Amino acid sequence: MSLVPDFSRRGFIRLAVAAPLLGQIAAKNAFATAATALGKNPRQNVYTRLGVRTVINCRGTWTYLSGSLEFPEVTAAQRQASEYFVNMFELQHAASRRLAELTGSEAGMVTSGAAGAMASATAACMAGGDPKNVWQLPDTTGLKDEVIMMGGRSAFDNAIRLTGAKLVLAETPEELASAINNSTAMIYTTHLGNALVSENIVAKKFNIPILLDDAAGIPPIDNLKLYAKMGLDLYTFSGGKGLRGPQCSGLLLGRKDLIEAAMKNTSPWEGSVCRAMKVGKEEIVGLLTAVETWLKTDLNALNREWNARVQRIEKLVQTVPGVETDISIPADGNRYPTLHISWDEKKWGYTVKDCVQQLRVGDPVIEVAGADNPSIVPAVHEGNPKRSSQEEPERRNLELVSSTIQPNEVLIVGQRIRELLNAARKAAPGA
């Protein structure tokens, strides 16, 4: 019988597995020290010169963390687009035709993010393309002006309300059918799967346009074509998240008549309610290029690469006794290999929130998904206020989203989390 406890044997094995990574960390630290001694700072850039710290982003494509990093092809296309003048009406329609070719939808347009698509779509469903109605918004007198929100309020529904629309809340297909009346202009949903199919059936029955907001729905890129095949009237994606296009861009796809109306309710039309949501020639060309690039990309190969990044971090943090980890891909959006890290918070006297904050204030700044959302207006209450519901439980693990972690950041992240967890474990009462 072995005299070495099982726990210690597991710890030894984990250390052995992580040994090559720990060696790389030591070499990397030595190189950084030497570079500093020579007066060179490898992290200096346009942001640090402004006094703004760059971030190692393990949280994903959040807007407050500047979304995603563009495909190199997108950056190159934007630079070329910036060198010419062009008629924006002509460019919008050319982009619409190209998006139709790429996605199978009848038409499409580039918007100022998915929220801009929500506003343009709502205006289109209320005012159509009639110039008098376009100029009238956000005054909705005499127009259909109710939008049924499936699932309740959202932090983003002001994109709908600013057009003058009124919100009506519904949760089930039955409630949706009951809520439809002569003032209903549009149905808004974020639901996927069977729920979306059921809602689309109701929308078709009553001839009411439905808008699907799937801002974080790419990857997979197949969703561009899936919703067209489902016959959705309108659907939107963020351009600055998984699509890796310009941060301030979005895609609105769907019926040609509604896309044409959406174009007439936004920039460059002067007097349109969405005029402020301007997108330039660079965003239009850049997002088209992002779609084209994605359609040539091997998602399986990307997933293997992303998975390898978080696996290396996992090996490092697993050397801390008492830490549990797993890697999975979410099914409802932000579909990237994601590392979950947990420990006995009560026993250690160290919470997920504590760890998130220490990572955030460190050097370098590391952002992970934890127990907070620093970018939400504190007064926001999502869902249906008429329903009695409990607060969402506080997150009990760290989440690291692989797609925004850069290859040269993997060891930095793994070692920093390992250091924090080791220190917390050793400082725990009774340790």
Sequence positions of predicted segments:
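Flexible, glycine/charged-enriched surface loops at secondary-structure junctions
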Residues: 88-93, 107-108, 274-278, 297-306, ...
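Generic N-terminal amphipathic, Lys/Arg-enriched alpha-helix
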Residues: 55-64, 75-82, 338-340
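Active-site pocket-lining segment
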Residues: 283-345
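N-terminal export signals
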Residues: 1-34
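Conserved N-terminal alpha-helix of the aminotransferase class I/II PLP-enzyme fold
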Residues: 71-113, 124
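A short N-terminal beta->alpha junction/helix N-cap motif
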Residues: 61-69, 79-90, 301, 404
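Conserved C-terminal alpha-helix-loop-beta "cap" of PLP-dependent enzymes
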Residues: 318-425, 429
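Conserved PLP-enzyme active-site core in the AAT-like
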Residues: 11-16, 20, 38-56, 60-68, ...
